[in-house]
Regions:
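Short, structured beta-strand-loop surface elements
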Residues: 54-122
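Short low-complexity stretches enriched in small and charged residues
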Residues: 1-7, 28-39, 71-79
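Extreme N-terminal tail/first-helix region
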Residues: 1-20
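Covalent nucleotidyltransferase core used to form phosphodiester bonds in nucleic acids
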Residues: 11-13, 48-61
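Residues embedded in well-ordered secondary-structure elements
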Residues: 12, 27-29, 109
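Short, solvent-exposed coil/turn segments
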Residues: 16-18, 33, 64, 113
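Short beta-strand segments
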Residues: 18-52, 69
Length: 122
């Protein structure tokens, strides 16, 4: 996680154009860094993440243990603080944002549990 951070403008521009980002979290048991591609929504300086299996998603469980994570989009990246959300109204709002961006069919196809989300203020 030692890459040089991108300026917020560069990262924001990349996020506004991307359909997928890479996140890097720290394993809650192993302590190792784990990177994986995920879908996201970028809106008004806020990054919304929806774990595919909700609270059963491994990267989400890792974020509960250590809130610092790295996001990378098109060569720009930054370390950020993740805010886990389990309020049903807030989670529903994030799910609707995902449906608007990716389509209801794909969200239904790939996401199996809608009990949590993650919000990152940039």
């Amino acid at each position: 996680m030692s890459k040089k951070p991108a300026s917020k403008d560069t990262l924001g521009h990349r996020l506004s154009r991307a359909t997928e980002i890479n996140i890097t979290v720290t394993g809650r048991k192993s302590g190792r860094t784990i990177s994986l591609p995920i879908w996201f929504v970028w809106e008004d300086g806020t990054l919304y993440l929806l774990p595919v299996k909700g609270s059963d998603t491994q990267w989400y469980k890792n974020v509960l243990k250590k809130r610092t994570m790295r996001i990378d989009a098109g060569g720009a990246g930054a370390e950020v603080q993740a805010v886990p959300v389990n309020d049903a109204t807030q989670v529903k709002s994030v799910v609707e944002k995902f449906r608007a961006k990716y389509g209801s069919g794909d969200v239904k196809k790939y996401y199996s549990k809608f009990d949590v989300a993650v919000i990152v203020q940039m």
